[in-house]
């Protein structure tokens, strides 16, 4: 009866863990469509890959079929995620991810396995150490999203914190916690307590910041106020610097009157369009008069 219950809980845990593994699929589909990783980070996926690799090694030592199956799938899928990330990441992010994968997923994992296989002869001791290391990195998997949590709090947006990943991560932590208790495997049960706490924290943040309109309205109002103040300051500076609206004085008025009374010079002819032809009176001179007649002269 107990074995059947343990197996049933393990199956449920595998299903939920599989959903957790598939939760970032929309995220990486978005990366593929936009050909850009935007603000997404590779650290959680590299840590998740290392955790799956360590648990796979632990499952091989303990002959736990349920842990073996789900962590094999986890290694494959997390590797695909990192491959997609490397294809579309900027140069700096790609270089950082490559260094991280080489140092952590290759060098560190190889060092752990080699040390346990070569230096620890007792099988029970090897299982205990492998379980402790696996539990430590399982905690790192749950702590890795803290960078995303900080980003959510700073930007007041859950755009880069996938909801379904947080949701299924929380459920998976609950199920694997009970699986560890039933199996009396505290290396499995202990890290999932922290996983439950961080999962609940992410769910709370999602509820608080899920309304982008409300958050953007506050941000837009503050931004609009800053723009308004800045515009007023710029307007005041323009008014002070512009000679067209400089304060008037007596000398300026006199100069303006003299300039208005001065006739147009040949160098500046008046614009014909500005003349009202209806108000112009043309002075036409009269026709020339004939010269007066000479008086008649009588001839004697």
Swiss-Prot record:
Similarity comment: family membership: Belongs to the SWEET sugar transporter family.
Name the record gives this protein: Bidirectional sugar transporter SWEET12
Primary role: Mediates both low-affinity uptake and efflux of sugar across the plasma membrane.
PANTHER family, A to Z: BIDIRECTIONAL SUGAR TRANSPORTER SWEET15 (PTHR10791:SF222), RAG1-ACTIVATING PROTEIN 1 (PTHR10791)
Bias-annotated ranges (Pro residues): 284-294
InterPro entries in the cross-refs: SWEET, SWEET_rpt
TM regions (residue ranges): 5-25, 39-61, 68-88, 100-120, 129-149, 163-183, 186-206
GO CC entries: plasma membrane
Cytoplasmic topological segments: 26-38, 89-99, 150-162, 207-300
Its membrane topology: Multi-pass membrane protein
Compositionally skewed regions (Basic and acidic residues) per UniProt: 269-280
Positions on the Extracellular side per record topology: 1-4, 62-67, 121-128, 184-185
Subunit structure: Forms homooligomers and/or heterooligomers.
Gene name tied to this protein: SWEET12
Keyword Cell membrane (UniProt): yes
Taxonomic superkingdom: Eukaryota
Keywords, in A-Z order: Cell membrane, Membrane, Repeat, Sugar transport, Transmembrane, Transmembrane helix, Transport
Sequence segments annotated as region (Disordered): 256-300
Subcellular location: Cell membrane
MtN3/slv domain boundaries: 8-92, 131-213
An example Gene Ontology molecular-function term: sugar transmembrane transporter activity
């Amino acid at each position: 009866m107990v074995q059947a219950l343990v197996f049933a809980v393990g199956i449920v845990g595998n299903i939920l863990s599989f959903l957790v593994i598939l939760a970032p699929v929309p995220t990486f589909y978005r990366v593929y469509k936009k050909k850009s990783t935007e603000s997404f980070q590779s650290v959680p996926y590299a840590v998740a890959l290392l955790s799956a690799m360590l648990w796979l090694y632990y499952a091989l030592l303990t002959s736990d079929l349920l842990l073996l199956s789900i962590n094999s799938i986890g290694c494959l899928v997390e590797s695909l995620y990192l491959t997609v990330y490397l294809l579309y990441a900027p140069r700096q992010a790609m270089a950082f991810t490559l260094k991280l994968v080489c140092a952590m997923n290759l060098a560190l994992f190889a060092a752990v396995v080699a040390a346990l296989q070569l230096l620890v002869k007792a099988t029970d001791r090897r299982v205990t150490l492998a379980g402790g290391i696996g539990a430590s990195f399982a905690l790192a998997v749950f702590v890795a999203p803290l960078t995303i949590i900080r980003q959510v709090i700073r930007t007041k947006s859950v755009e880069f914190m996938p909801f379904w990943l947080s949701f299924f991560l929380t459920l998976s932590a609950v199920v694997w916690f009970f699986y560890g208790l039933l199996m009396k495997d505290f290396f499995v049960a202990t890290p999932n307590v922290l996983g439950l706490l961080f999962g609940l924290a992410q769910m709370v943040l999602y509820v608080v910041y899920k309304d982008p309109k409300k958050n953007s309205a506050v941000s837009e109002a503050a931004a609009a106020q800053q723009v308004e103040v800045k515009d007023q300051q710029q307007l005041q500076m323009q008014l002070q610097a512009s000679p067209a609206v400089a304060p008037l004085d007596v000398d300026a008025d006199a100069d303006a009157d003299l300039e208005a009374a001065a006739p147009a010079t040949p160098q500046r002819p008046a614009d014909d369009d500005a003349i009202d032809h209806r108000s112009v009176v043309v002075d036409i001179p009269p026709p020339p008069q004939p010269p007066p007649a000479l008086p008649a002269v009588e001839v004697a």
